[in-house]
From Swiss-Prot:
InterPro entries: HATPase_C_sf, HSP90_C, Hsp90_fam, Hsp90_N, Ribosomal_Su5_D2-typ_SF. It comes from Dictyostelium discoideum. It is found in: Endoplasmic reticulum; Golgi apparatus. Residues 733-743 have a biased composition (Polar residues). This is Endoplasmin homolog. Phosphorylated. GO terms for molecular function: ATP binding; ATP hydrolysis activity; ATP-dependent protein folding chaperone; unfolded protein binding. Residues 1-28 form the signal peptide. The lineage of its organism: Eukaryota, Amoebozoa, Evosea, Eumycetozoa, Dictyostelia.
Amino acid sequence: MKSITKIFLILGLFAFLLVAFAPSSSVATVNLESDGYTEAEAKLIEEKGEKFTFQTEVNKLMNIIINSLYSKKEIFLRELISNASDALDKIRFLALTNADLLGEGEQSNLDIHIKIDKANNVLHITDRGVGMTKDELVRNLGTIAQSGTKEFIKKVSDSAESSNLIGQFGVGFYSLFLVADSVVVTSKSNDDDQYVWTSDSQSSYTIAKDPKGNTLGRGTRISLHIKDDSKEFLDQEVIKQLVKKYSQFINFPIYLYVSEEVEIPKEEQEDSKPITDDQVEETTTTTEEGEEETTTEEEGQTEEKKTKTVYKWEELNDSKPLWMKAAKDVTKEEYTEFFRSLSKTQDTPITYSHFKTEGDTEFRSILYIPENPPSNMFDLEAAGSGLKLFVRRVFITDNLKELVPNWLRFLVGVIDSDDLPLNVSREMLQQNKILDAIKKKVILVKFISMIKELSEDEDKTKYNEFFKKFGSSMKLGAIEDQANKKRLTKYLLFPSSKEELTTFAGYVERMKEGQDQIYFITGKSKDSVEASPLIEQAIKKGYEVLFLVDPIDEYLVPQLDKFDDKYKFTNLARSGVKFNEDKEEEDQRKQTAEEFKPLLSYLKKTLSDKLEKVVISKVLADSPSILVSNSWGVTANQERIMKAQAHQANAQPQFNSKKIMEINPSHPLIKKLLNRLNEFGEEDETTKVSAHVLYETSALTAGYSIDNPTNFADFIYKLMMINGDSLAQTNFETTKNENSGPSVSFGDDDENQQQDFQQPPQSTHDEL
């Protein structure tokens, strides 16, 4: 919000603030002698130069630009190189119709040179571009928000060449005052003499004819007098890194004047003197020529080395923008190497897409699906992403929250647009239809195209491996992106009772005749759900069951409703599951429910604080009972996930919704429990203990946690003793627990208890 307010403030000021140029005796304080001018030449510029004073309002606007508009000081270099690139593009375009404009020899080389003068704290940036006349210096540099590039684009708006021009606002130049307290701009146009423009950003600027004459031939040199707190930008390694970060794909070569220490060959060394025997330590001295002389002694031998500092122009952007080439001209090895340079790994991408879009907006892009997910894939607060945005080959940002959905943060690649408008600082993207087009037409469409191609390959290994690593992200996409939910859902994979991995479409193809539901179960792992009693009847009847074992699956399925608008998703962990039954099976179920009605009522009454109801199960085949949730309740897997999230958030949510118990009337244990209830009635202690044990074990097998493990253990102990001896011959004490029913505490006669367990008499009760 602050950034938006800032932009509107600046744009508002642009709307009504104009620079008025009034002659003034005030002169910008600039040390011209540190730029190579003699004292006399500097004095001549001061005396003969035309001096202008910024109006008060414009001076305030300058302060806003310098202190508020840009968030990073390093941006200045990107802006100045971009301006230099614009100037080179202009002269190249003009030379298409008049080749003489380029000149001859070195002057015809279109390039950018950067030179560091540490002695004077000056950074020079020189281009052989179109240059500026005196009037253009006043108009382009003396007037804020008056961009020469913008005006030039108007002149050549009918030509495609203009799309290479970077500048869109006239404030990028002033970013130099982030690191410099004053600046000297020397410029030579083919249409005028060479002029010098100087300013300290505080009050005024001066324009004068250069007393040195035409030293540039053509082009512009910007000399920044670096502030004391910004001297890191006089370090050649820092400059190299910034050029590589922001401008390595500029169309024109960028050279830096670098220094390095080299060893002087022995045959070129002069005045070599052997060291004496008493010199046993290494010594280093500097020669008058700036050479270093290193001498050592080893086993009485004399070894002498000399080094010297040499200077040379080093090209910093020899990497060409791969995405600007036609896909047919790029080798697989080049794609792989480019991916590695972007991802900073030695991995090989799973697949990639190199494309160009045309129409209302034009984009060039290379998108990669990486071999491995980034470590911060689900860290929504992490800065940056694997995708980098360029505008006319200039790096803008990798913070692309406006363009890249959270679930696609793993993508690696570049997007370059000639049409994308930026705000005045080029750091924040304006919300508009072009951004929306990039998001929908470039990123989403191409990603879906890539996974479609992978999934349709006869060898499913590559797609299956991709999905194991990035499937959770795709599921998140199906949840968040309603517009593309159906398209993404087609490519989701799940393990099942019949396949290692299957799509929903594959499941539907294998459906039984008359089946109109997709049966699934959620859980912690494939092994755990394969062993769940909830799938017994489905498997027995020949139905395939999907195993949804990714935590995000719990949130995905409710968003899907139906697959292909036809097949409903049915969670076997919820009540109301239905299988196709004939009339005979339905009648048998009704008869069974009537037969077991006493037990159903008894269990509901005894466990009323825990159960919503007790019903005859349709999902069990081999197990005696199970707990399920109702249609709106919390399943066992949901409870597990929610508890884990609550633990991370240091909170304790309540999971007190009542469950539904389903019993299997064909299981011997359930039959015996019904018989005992009918024989001994509801007050029988063994029946009560059995009911509680049945509930707790049903909860465990369903995946729910036990509220009170101690009480559960007491029930187990008591049941063991009931089966081992009669209640009358066993010394224990029964206590009531108002929440969990009866529990058992043993007496103090341990010896008698041990004897009873060693030689138990015949029980008079039915063993459960």
